[in-house]
Amino acid sequence: MSKKTKQELENNKLSKRLRHAVGDAINDFNMIEPGDKIMVCLSGGKDSYALLDILRQLQASAPIDFELVAVNLDQKQPGFPEEVLPTYLESIGVPYKIVEEDTYSTVKRVLDEGKTTCSLCSRLRRGILYRTAKELGCTKIALGHHRDDILATMFLNMFYGGKLKAMPPKLVSDNGEHIVIRPLAYVKEKDLIKYAELKQFPIIPCNLCGSQPNLQRQVIGDMLRDWDKRFPGRIESMFSALQNVVPSHLADTELFDFAGLERGQTLKHGGDLAFDSEKMPERFSDGSEEDESEIKIAPQKAERKVINILANKPKTCGA
């Protein structure tokens, strides 16, 4: 097999893996429904480019109809290449809207020198995007956070916030007006890096947060990448833990009635047997990698009727 052919096979495998991971997340959390108008938030980074690209693929083949509109928030950062995103979006034929709001000056004016900008920037950006979604009549807002972002958020909340809290794949906004979805929830960041190289997306760096090397999130990200190299399967196992929560073996009295426990009650989640060691799944213990399209990360849930986004569109007569 030639080097070129081998690379083509690897690229096809990567594309299939990403498509299936996104499709599985959409199916598991019922992210997209018939007739949805989805606002895809496009920052110019690798993650949001990949999100839009994969959603377009699914839109073309899915058994349901839904609309996509790309939205970019031009925060008036110095040197921001305003022409890059419109040129790209017009070249692929995606409807889009560029929202111009000078949040850059606001963040720089309000925060002291040396302070991290992410929290304030995120709040300002979120409010503008919610307003834009309402103006466009969008039913869903799609963000480009991936699996590693979700895990990093969990550790940030544990280490610095004292909460066992991550980043939900799907949520309702605080005002109750918007459904926010994260279709990349099952996707590895390292796969997105490879995909961006394959697709040659015109990446735009962020001058606000990209220039702050000591951000807590970046430190956590470095920790996760180090673990992924030294302990194959650890990241997958941690994400699986987010989907297999046992409230009776934590310490939150709001989630479980510890005070009401009495002798003779039915065992809850195995009782003290839950402390016994369990056999580690082979793909976690030996570091081997399987075809991601065959791995079902989510635990088995109650039967419910969902539309498989990975299925094909129904054929029409005469097609």
From Swiss-Prot:
Disulfide bonds: none annotated. Pathway: tRNA modification. GO terms for molecular function: 4 iron, 4 sulfur cluster binding; ATP binding; magnesium ion binding; sulfurtransferase activity; tRNA binding. It catalyses: cytidine(32) in tRNA + S-sulfanyl-L-cysteinyl-[cysteine desulfurase] + AH2 + ATP = 2-thiocytidine(32) in tRNA + L-cysteinyl-[cysteine desulfurase] + A + AMP + diphosphate + H(+). It comes from the Bacteria. Its cofactor is Mg(2+); [4Fe-4S] cluster. It is found in: Cytoplasm. A motif (PP-loop motif) lies at residues 43-48. [4Fe-4S] cluster binds at C118, C121, C209. Gene3D superfamilies: HUPs. GO terms for cellular component: cytoplasm. Pfam families: ATP_bind_3. It is an enzyme of class 2 (transferase). Keywords: 4Fe-4S, ATP-binding, Cytoplasm, Iron, Iron-sulfur, Magnesium, Metal-binding, Nucleotide-binding, RNA-binding, Transferase, tRNA processing, tRNA-binding. SUPFAM superfamilies: Adenine nucleotide alpha hydrolases-like. Belongs to the TtcA family. The thiolation reaction likely consists of two steps: a first activation step by ATP to form an adenylated intermediate of the target base of tRNA, and a second nucleophilic substitution step of the sulfur (S) atom supplied by the hydrosulfide attached to the Fe-S cluster. Homodimer. This is tRNA-cytidine(32) 2-sulfurtransferase. It comes from Neisseria meningitidis serogroup C (strain 053442). The gene is ttcA.
